[in-house]
Amino acid sequence: MKVKTITRGTSLTRLNDQDPVKRNLDPSLHPFERAREYTRALNATKMDRMFAAPFLGQLGRGHQDGVYSLARDTKTLIDCASGSGDGAVKLWDASERCERWTSKAHEGIVRGLVFSNQGDVLSCASDRYVYMLNKQDGKVKRSYLGDSSLLDIDTSKGGDLFATSGENVSIWDYSRDTPVTKFEWGADTLPVVKFNYTETSVLASAGMDRSIVIYDLRTSSPLTKLITKLRTNSISWNPMEAFNFVAGSEDHNLYMYDMRNLKRALHVYKDHVSAVMSVDFSPTGQEFVSGSYDKTIRIYNVREGHSRDVYHTKRMQRVTAVKFSMDAQYIFSGSDDSNVRLWRARASSRASIRSTREENRLKYLDSLRERYKHIPEIRRIARHRHLPTNVKKAAEIKREEINSLKRREENIRRHSKKGAVPYEKERERHVVGIQK
């Protein structure tokens, strides 16, 4: 009699290998596939909220005064600098959450911080000085004297240039003691200046006169001036889409603009209940983070008008500065309670090493959550957040005010001649005018 046996080669398997599972993917054999996937998506959403723990801790023992500026080193993942109201600049090691050095360089509030292309720290303050601090020990390598109080600073990624803003926008060369070029358009103060990451000769500034001005170093002249309804407090360029930038406004919203067409905003981002003080793009260009006067930090997807997450703590006060880390996994925040805090960009993510099976499982659950995110139950769980009482109450009052204004406008339109009260588009409402 002939007996058939199953044999396996010992060289093809290992002791801890998982037995392969044979699956037939024919849909007719899986009539309950959709129900199973919905259950998995629901459980994955619940587990995601259950493991959400965004706050990692504060860096060191903080400052002696409020933190008003932050900078990240674009060549490393762990270096972050902060400037405070007492004129001190500190360099932090994010991996150890400790302080490397402190430099008491300035006599006034450190308004602007940035890392130079060589890795040194550039700081500016209301005492009119710009100091280049050695990254290794914090000692002053070089100083520059401006014409007036300096409110912001940024470096060009394409050369040895940096820009400062105050009464005007000044372009400096590292090797010169005086500005190479000065830009002026109007007579008001300019608290914000930012270089484009990709088009390195283009920069933007925001003024106290509610203006946003685009400059081009190749023509040594301003290009366009946008006038908005309320003042812009912060600007950040998209590192992946060279023409787009987001602006944080005093009207609690953020606006995405295309520098080629400033007649309307590309997107309007809502949810804050007080002025937006700082905004910064993720290195991926898909998300950005904002810090507000309402003591919260919000993370936005560039294609969604509402925040995907909101961070807050009981002790954190008004957020004055936020920055993404260069790997887009962490967020630095500075507030006027003198602390620099470290957050996860994904509240439920962990930095531990994952096996291939675990990585594939997480990707599968992410795809299920994305597929079923519009189901009411899953959407409710994914969107639910606990907010401070004052923020929740302010949001309710703001919602009632907006609905009241809408009803009033609709009543006026209903009792007026047809076409006398035109509809005002949301993306054009914030724009007052454009000058060239």
UniProtKB/Swiss-Prot annotation:
Molecular function (GO) terms for this protein are: snoRNA binding
Q: What does this protein do?
A: Required for ribosomal RNA processing.
* WD repeat positions: 62-102, 105-143, 145-175, 176-225, 227-267, 271-310, 314-353
Question: Which organism is this protein's natural source?
Answer: Schizosaccharomyces pombe (strain 972 / ATCC 24843) (Fission yeast)
* Keyword match Nucleus: yes
Q: CDD domains recorded for this chain?
A: WD40
Which keywords label this protein?
A: Cytoplasm, Cytoskeleton, Nucleus, Repeat, WD repeat
Report whether Cytoplasm shows up as a keyword of the record: yes
Residue spans of biased composition, Basic and acidic residues class: 423-436
Which domain of life does the protein's organism represent? Eukaryota
Q: Where in the cell is it found?
A: Nucleus, Nucleolus; Cytoplasm, Cytoskeleton, Spindle
User: Which gene underlies this protein?
Assistant: sof1
> What cellular component GO annotations does this protein have?
cytoplasm; mitotic spindle; nucleolus; nucleus; small-subunit processome
What's a GO biological-process term for it?
Answer: maturation of SSU-rRNA from tricistronic rRNA transcript (SSU-rRNA, 5.8S rRNA, LSU-rRNA)
Q: Where is this region: Disordered?
A: 411-436
What family does this chain come from, according to its entry? Belongs to the WD repeat DCAF13/WDSOF1 family.
Which Pfam families does the UniProt record give? Sof1, WD40
- Alphabetized InterPro entries for the sequence: G-protein_beta_WD-40_rep, Quinoprotein_ADH-like_sf, Sof1, WD40/YVTN_repeat-like_dom_sf, WD40_rpt, WD_repeat_DCAF13/WDSOF1
Protein name, UniProt field: Protein sof1
Q: Which Gene3D superfamilies match?
A: YVTN repeat-like/Quinoprotein amine dehydrogenase (2.130.10.10)
Q: How does it assemble?
A: Interacts with snoRNA U3. Component of the ribosomal small subunit (SSU) processome composed of at least 40 protein subunits and snoRNA U3.
